[in-house]
Structures are given as C-alpha cells and as structure tokens.
Amino acid sequence: MDKRRFLEALGEAFLPIRPAGQIVLANTLAKELFQEERLEGRKVGALVCNQELLGHVQEAFDTDGPVTKEFTLSAANSPGGVQNGITAWHLDSAITDTPIKEKRILLRNVTQNYLTNQMRRDFVANASHELRTPLTIIVGYLENLMEDNLMEESPGLARKFIGVMHQNSQRLMNIIEDMLMISKLESGHKAILKEQWFHLTSCVDDVFSRLDSIREKKQAALHMNIPPDWELYGDPFYWTQVLFNLVENALKQNTEPGLSVTVAAARTPEACVITVTDTGVGIPAESLPFLFNRFYRVETHHSSEIKGTGLGLSIVKRAVEAHDGAITVSSTPHRETVFTITIPLKRFREEKEA
C-alpha cells in the first residue's frame, strides 16, 4: 500500500507539518476538516483563525519527543465551520526519521465523544441530586418518628409523617423507573420494542382515562382527532408512554382553568404525523432547544410546584427515535404549544411487505 492510500485508510484527518508550519500533505478527511480542496504547501496559520488551536500546534512543535493531548476550543473559528458552542480535539504528534525533520500531527475532532461524556457526567450529577432530595426527606421523617416516639404520643402527626414518606418513596420509584426506561431505549433501541399493528385510539383512550382526575382538577378539556381505524406499527406500550408524558406535561405546566389539549393524527404522502397541541401559556423560545434534555425544567413562576422526574420528555424523544421517528416542538406564548411526531411511511410499507 502506497503512502497516499495508507493516509486515506487511516480514518482520521492526517497532517504532516514541517516546523515552519508548512503542510507536507493531507488526506481527504483533513481537507474536509479544514473545508479546503488544497492543503499541501500551505501554512496552518493561514487556514486557522483560532489562536488557541495554533497555540496547541506550536506547543507540539516546541516539545521534544511525541505529544498526545486533548483540548477544547471555543467553536466560533474552529475548523469545520462550527459557529457556536464548544469543539473538542485530540492531537498526536511524532518526529519523522527523514533528513528534514517533520513533526507529524494527527488532529481529530472528538466533539461528539466529548459531548457524550459530558452528558453522562451531567446525568450522574443530576440523577444524584434528584434522588437525594426525596431520600433526605424520608430519612429526616424516619428519624423524627424513631427519636420522638410519635407513633404512641401523637399518632395523627405520625400518620402525616408516614404519608410524606410514602409520597417521596413513590417519587423515588418514578425517577428510577424513568431512568431504567431511558437506559433501555438508549442501549437496545429497536431490540427492546415489542412491535405489532395497533389502533392509536386505544392508546389515547388509555391516556385520557389515567389523566382524568388531573384533567378534572385543572378544569381542562382533552380531545382526540384520530380516525377510529387509524393503525400504527410499533410498540403500543411505548406509544402510550409517549402520549401520556406529552398530555400530562401539558396539564401540569398550565395552572389556569380552561386548558384544551388535543391529540391528532394524519397521513401525508411520506409520513404519519401525530400532534399534541395545548392552548396553555406556552414555552419560552430560549427553552425550546433544551426541552428534551434530561432533568431540564422550564423556569416559570410556578415551576417549583410542578412535580415530576424531569425525564418525561427525554423518554418521549428516545421512544420516538426508536421507532425511526422524529419529534419537534413549536410554541406561541399564551396561545398554543404543538409537539409534532413524524414517522416515515416507508417503515410501515416495509413491514406490510415483509
């Protein structure tokens, strides 16, 4: 295998660079990374505006022996044209044995891995916080029951304490169940689905029945606009969970009476489209990009009163994606919020032909 074919087979952006900063050659992935057709003979400093990245490259040149390091950059002027956020990079370098000493540099964009690891760290931190709160309450009330002998001296107060502990133990169970559900969806995706043809109306009926007490308390109206024979191919358990989370979320987020929530479904030439629309207070525009993140909660004047695990919409997104679908959200403050689920019809055609 010649040098050029070897470089193309690396699977990484590869840039042998001379000490003066001149690029000796570059493979296709390096050209894609810098969005340039011709890199050979050019200087790195002429290609990269980000002084942080140039600093790391220069440090690799100035260091005797091989260098391996990972670093993050502000993304505004990073290679690849990313305009916001953070990019993460892995740099390896070594000195050649050729008469003209070159510092070979292997530069990789590892942003996706960085973000995945960051998400895991955030999840552990958030999960620990969410679990600690009800556990602390339960332990505190148990200590009072044991130390003050309340069961005998004040049975009424003791029953109240037990009720609080039961409520928080239920919250713990809900968090754990939601975490397990997300874990299943992310690890197995389609492998965990028990797919079959089913009527979507049966899922909606189940959801409305389970949420009827909240609907009545909120003085809200629940509507369904789906043909009776409308069928989906998928796991009815997860579709029921998706619709339950979306409708429950609409009911919980809106405190004023008169709310209307509508679940509708229709077919386009290319997709099945399911929408959940509510006529409530809406969602601030700045919150929309983060809405499906784990434990994210929209900040409102009554957000502290809303009970939940903070995982409901994350479960919705992953369950929809497990069915090859996509979900988006749009919101007009004080008018309506619409969650739109799109599932390609190709998925159903393939199943019917199988």
Where are these regions (language model features)?
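Sensory modules in modular signal-transduction proteins
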Residues: 1-34
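PAS-family sensory/regulatory modules and their coupling/dimerization elements
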Residues: 44-112
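Short alpha-helical segment of the dimerization/phosphotransfer core of two-component systems
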Residues: 167-172
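Conserved micro-motifs of the catalytic ATP-binding
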Residues: 187-193, 231-234
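Conserved catalytic submotifs in the C-terminal HATPase_c
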Residues: 196-197, 216, 221-230
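Short conserved segment of the HATPase_c
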Residues: 283-295
